[in-house]
């Protein structure tokens, strides 16, 4: 049985205390755009042209990967590698060559992730990359959450309504993200339960 354990190495911080290295940003949610999937495909091709040897899989994650869902217009990309140590040697500089900044300071809180972001000429964040070991808890949890919302549009709408409400309540991204944690954890648990049921049924045949 595949189990996904709750671990602190996740995009959304589990701690209720705001890390000192996080910068406040105002929340902007854009209506869903088909351009987001096309933008991911473009970045995916660029990444594969440089790190195909080490990237075992590249996935579009986060709210921009869920059709119909309003989101912060930032393309979330997750790269799965066999080994972070190999990725440190071979992938980091290649990703930087595509215009991404490697934000190493976040590894104090998230040592099992390498984080990169790309910004527009105006300094607005447009893309972010989470480089993790494939099939790690971080990898599985991101995909469980994304796939569950893709399969359940009504739940995705609940999530959108929550995000819109929280965006009016909180003035920076950390508080906004932290306030979504309970909803996300509940969805992860439901998705894991569905996965376990399918695995139990498959073992009967």
Where are each of the predicted segments found?
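Histidine-centered active-site/metal-ligand motif
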Residues: 60, 127-130, 142
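A short acidic-to-branched-hydrophobic micro-motif
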Residues: 77, 126-133
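Catalytic cores of NTP-dependent nucleotidyl/adenyl transfer enzymes across multiple folds
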Residues: 135-205
């Amino acid at each position: 049985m595949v189990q996904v354990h709750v671990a602190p190495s996740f995009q959304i911080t589990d701690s209720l205390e705001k890390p000192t290295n996080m910068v406040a940003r105002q929340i902007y949610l854009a209506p869903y755009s088909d351009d987001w999937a096309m933008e991911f495909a473009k970045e995916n091709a660029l990444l594969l042209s440089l790190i195909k040897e080490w990237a075992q899989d590249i996935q579009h994650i986060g709210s921009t990967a869920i059709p119909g869902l309003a989101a912060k217009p930032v393309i979330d990309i997750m790269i799965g590698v066999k080994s972070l140590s190999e990725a440190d040697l071979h992938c980091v500089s290649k990703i930087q060559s595509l215009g991404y900044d490697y934000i190493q300071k976040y590894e104090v809180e998230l040592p099992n992730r390498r984080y990169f972001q790309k910004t527009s000429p105006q300094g607005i964040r447009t893309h972010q990359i989470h480089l993790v070991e494939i099939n790690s808890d971080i990898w599985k949890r991101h995909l469980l959450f994304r796939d569950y919302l893709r399969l359940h549009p009504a739940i995705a709408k609940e999530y959108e309504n929550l995000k819109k409400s929280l965006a009016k309540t909180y003035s920076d991204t950390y508080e906004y993200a932290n306030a979504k944690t309970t909803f996300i954890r509940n969805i992860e648990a439901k998705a894991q339960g569905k996965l376990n049921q399918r695995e139990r049924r498959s073992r009967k045949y």
